[in-house]
Amino acid sequence: MHRYFIAHLIALVIILVLMPETKKVQARQNAQSPKPAAASSPNLEGVWEGPLDVGAMKLRLAFKVTKAADGALAAKFRSLDQSADELTVDVVSLKESAVHFELQRLAVVFDGEVNQAGSEITGQFKKGGVSFPLTLKRVAKPTTLNRPQEPKPPYPYDAEEVSYENKRDGIKLAGTLTLPRGKTSVPAVILITGSGAQNRNEELMGHKPFLVLADYLTRQGIAVLRVDDRGVGGSTGSVPDSTSENFAADVMAGIEFLKKHQGINPKQIGLIGHSEGGLIAPMVAAQSNDVAFIVMLAGPGLPGEEILYLQGALILKANGASDEVLARQHASQEKIFTLLKQEKDIAVVEKRLREEFDKQMANASESAKAQGQQALEAQLKQVLSPWFRYFLTYDPRVALAKVKCPVLALNGENDLQVPVTENLREIEATLKTAGNKDVTTVRLPKLNHLFQTSETGSPDEYGKIEETLAPTALKMMGDWILKHTHSQQ
């Protein structure tokens, strides 16, 4: 959300299901692109762009290469569908036609060959041991990301840089509190990000959803606290060793902070959680009487395992996977998930997963096996993490049944990560059966998991869509919160 659940969805599925097919494509590309016998090094200066196919989506990558007066090469890297930020390439080299880029902090290496025309670089993009074919083409005009909803200063409200402590876990949390100017005792919300380490703006795919949401709500007279996740920005701690329970404790600390702020009405503090954040919000509301309301944005209503089955099939189907691939994926997921649930010893789980990998790759080529082995090492860390094991078996209905405050649950009809029908149905049924009389669930047409207006809902579209948050979703949240805090303007 949002890394959402995608990273975990493809954790071993890419290896066990898609990797052999990917390797075949790579082999065909290599056969069609023989290594040129370059007499001298071509000109590498300029902008090079190309799509990286990682199975569940395609990410557009860009390298901008410059040359100093002394001939030294330098480069900047951008993942166009993930962030607008440029990152410095640590190592840039060109020897005859061989190109080498390294981004050490991201564990990224690209090795390629420039064609004789100097218009294309064909090679391998490696990230943390996983290798994918990548073809970069020289472009005259770099691709720019247009994000028209991102607010620009000056703002008609106040913004405070804040920090506070989660005393239970010894974590310092840092964020931004936006406050309606010239008002006191205003309602407030805490924004809760989706899975993975994200900054206070929930920045992903070149979008900053929580920045846009905070700006909109604060203009409506609602204070908004958005916070860096553990280990991100100004916050301490670590995400890999944490579970949703730990993140819920972080939110509880945020509530205590807001209760003491002189500009906030302590009886009108609510939570807005996106994706996994929509799982955490009910956890907190079930424990604390200080939560006045919650908004679940694509929040789960089913156990993690069930969501991953649905999610995996929908995303692969949207990307053109055959029924055979879908069946193989489900079977592989089922084996992995059953093992994770039944075996508590991590060492035993790892051993069994390696054996399963060897079995699945038995008929693959030697080169495919080598590539798959690299991917296995990188992805094992994810499925063996405390977070994944917790998420797999956690049933959000247990906490939902204890939530007594008003609830607004929104899902996009094109959401392929937290499918709308199954999850909204369970959320509504659980809350109402438990006696909650103020429950609103809404299906929003054409909106995806990020609440963007979309064509298919595939994660492949996220970064390509200019809209960050659909105005219909923003207005629905703002109106509902104002109604429930009696603060209509």
Question: Language-model features: where?
Answer:
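Short substrate-entry loop that stabilizes the transition state in hydrolases
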Residues: 184-186, 195-225, 304, 416-417
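Alpha/beta-hydrolase active-site loop
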Residues: 209, 241-262
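Accessory cap/linker subdomain of secreted extracellular hydrolases
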Residues: 295-402
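Central antiparallel beta-sheet cores of small beta-barrel/beta-sandwich binding domains
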Residues: 34-128, 149, 156, 162, ...
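Short beta-strand/loop motif that positions the catalytic acidic residue
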Residues: 403, 409-411
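Conserved alpha/beta-hydrolase "acid-adjacent" motif
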Residues: 416-424
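N-terminal cap/lid segment of alpha/beta-hydrolase-fold proteins
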Residues: 53, 142-184
